[in-house]
Amino acid sequence: MTSQNPTQEPENNDHLIISQDSQHPANLIPELCAKFWHLGWVTGTGGGASIRKDDLVYLAPSGVQKELMKPEHIYVLDITKQLDPKQRIYLRSPPNLKPSQCTPLFMAAFTKRNAGCCIHTHSKWAVLITLLLESAPNTTMFEINNIEQIKAFGKGYTKSGNLGYHDTLRIPVIENTPHEEDLTEYLEEAMEKYPDTYAVLVRRHGVYVWGESVHKAKTQCESLDYLFQIAVDMKKLGLPWLSDVKPIA
């Protein structure tokens, strides 16, 4: 298991999380987490979010009720100084709190996909999809097409434009582990195997979603949760997730 023991630089650098700008990461993360809590995505301190701004990464902490989170709860690290993943160096650490075990997974999105934001939810719809897939022919891939909301997703890393209505959205599934940080290597493997994906489902656990900006990550996370809900209802009605709808000439 990867150690999450943080190394704190001498000065706590509280100035990094103090800003009147509503779009500053230290203000945005608590706002987003409160919204996600109301959606049922981050119940009981589960889940989280992280934003990268230039070389600085802002992270929600572990163990804080998401609807009560404040800027002073936010961790900050410099992505260029993380030479040893087993010993992260934080520029700013809130007192009496612990870094999230999601941190190495968020870092994977930033370093391997140049993401600007990564969101982790425990959405019941994400969990249900992974359960439904346990009895599917392909247990490690969620696929759906011919649904309008698919247009919210980009075509893939380094590619321009978004998916179309008739395209197939594919989200890989990895198995859960007893400790969240131990998911990192499996998440990274999924990123390598499926370079066009913007999300990875974790069996009986939740989903990680990222994007090049906060706007894109949030849009894709909301759209994916909508598609998960649609897919669960489709399964109840005996409707296939993949269909052969002919384009209108």
Swiss-Prot record:
The keyword RNA-binding does not apply. Its cofactor is Zn(2+). Its EC number is 4.2.1.109. It is found in: Cytoplasm. Pathway: Amino-acid biosynthesis; L-methionine biosynthesis via salvage pathway; L-methionine from S-methyl-5-thio-alpha-D-ribose 1-phosphate: step 2/6. It holds the Pfam family Aldolase_II. SMART domains: Aldolase_II. Substrate binds at C102. One of its GO terms (cellular component) is cytoplasm. Gene3D superfamilies: Class II aldolase/adducin N-terminal domain. Binds 1 zinc ion per subunit. InterPro entries: Aldolase_II/adducin_N, Aldolase_II/adducin_N_sf, MethylthioRu-1-P_deHdtase_MtnB, Salvage_MtnB_euk. GO terms for molecular function: methylthioribulose 1-phosphate dehydratase activity; zinc ion binding. The active site is at E148 (proton donor/acceptor). Keywords: Amino-acid biosynthesis, Cytoplasm, Lyase, Metal-binding, Methionine biosynthesis, Zinc. GO terms for biological process: L-methionine salvage from methylthioadenosine. HAMAP family: Salvage_MtnB_euk. Belongs to the aldolase class II family. MtnB subfamily. Catalyzes the dehydration of methylthioribulose-1-phosphate (MTRu-1-P) into 2,3-diketo-5-methylthiopentyl-1-phosphate (DK-MTP-1-P). This is Methylthioribulose-1-phosphate dehydratase. It comes from Botryotinia fuckeliana (strain B05.10). The gene is mde1.
